[in-house]
Amino acid sequence: MRILIFGGTGFVGAHYARHLLEARPVAQVVLCDKAPLDESRYAPVLVQALRDPRCSFRQLDLRQRIPDDLAEGGVDLIANFAAVHREPGHEAWEYFETNLLGADNVCEFADRIGCKTILFTSSISPYGPSELERDEKSLPVPSTPYGASKLAAEKIHLGWHRGGDDRRLLIVRPGVVFGPGEGGNVTRMIRFLRKGLFVYLGNRGVRKSGIYVKSLSRMFEWGLERLGDPSFCNIRPGAAFFNASFDPPPSVEDYVKAIREVGEFKRPVFNIPFKLIYAISHLFMGIGGIHPVRMRKLVRPNLILPSFLKHLDYDWKWDLRSAMADWKCEKPEDWA
């Protein structure tokens, strides 16, 4: 089996590649991305796994046509994880340029070479902001360029799927993905809690859908294995999608409690009114990642439920606390 991972040296791509190499009898995994793997970012165990002779790197820009020679040896699965996603951080057109052109080029390439299976990671962003719980049956109403571009990219992949009855498509909408080497919001939360700098911004009970990166890799495999089952395919025969999150979505306080317990952080956590922090973010916008949009995201719930997984009695393996413990065990420097 030969697998191409677009966005292969990114956070999700690197962890999925490791999962494939350790759990599947694959002949080759090709990491396709704009830059090679930044080994300093990841745990030694992941870096060592990706040094497997079955794993190789191919530099390319997914906004351009994918060359034919990438298909030499055949392609059994294409995983499309490539995206511009940091929000804020880019102009509106940049999300659409990368996320739509990338989807177009991946689907055109799959059509050209005869690959029958695509795995695509979307996002919960297409659902848009709401105080209400939503799941796979809810209407997406994206409110940001990123969310809109991801929803449009889903439709492009669905258009590819309609091109043949033997095609298989799995679309996964993850919440916040965290774990070893993430370097994002949860990593910052760990760092601030360790230093005693973390404060609640009136958001103690705000729920944030999220998933451990290793859980996400297991979900990919679980879903791909079931695409031949008509009862599993909730879009049409051969195509399915689901939300990827813990059930129920953890609150900010749940994240804090799990991190403090695993990290053995004893410093107290205080609560500061959001209006005060929001005003300060305008004064110091752009310094150290401070931005009013990010401040608003901290107090805005994303109650996206994994109802599809729950209905099928999916085994998450890790809960929030055990995920944090596994992360600390694998990459303790993220916690030091």
Residue ranges, per PLM feature:
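N-terminal Rossmann NAD(P)H-binding glycine-rich loop of SDR-like oxidoreductase domains
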Residues: I3-A23
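NAD(P)H-binding glycine-rich loop region in Rossmannoid oxidoreductase-like domains
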Residues: S56-T98
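Glycine-rich NAD(P)-binding loop of the Rossmann-fold in SDR/ketoreductase-type enzymes
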Residues: E94-N105, P140, T144, A148-L151, ...
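Conserved Rossmann-fold NAD(P)-dependent oxidoreductase catalytic core, especially the SDR/UDP-sugar
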Residues: N105-P145, D165, L170
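Conserved beta-loop-beta element that borders a ligand/cofactor-binding pocket
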Residues: K155-P180
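Substrate-positioning beta->alpha
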Residues: E182-R188, G202-L227, A239-A240
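Mid/C-terminal beta-alpha module of Rossmann-like enzyme folds, strongest
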Residues: R226-H291, M324-D326, D334-A336
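Amphipathic terminal alpha-helices
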Residues: H311, D315-A336
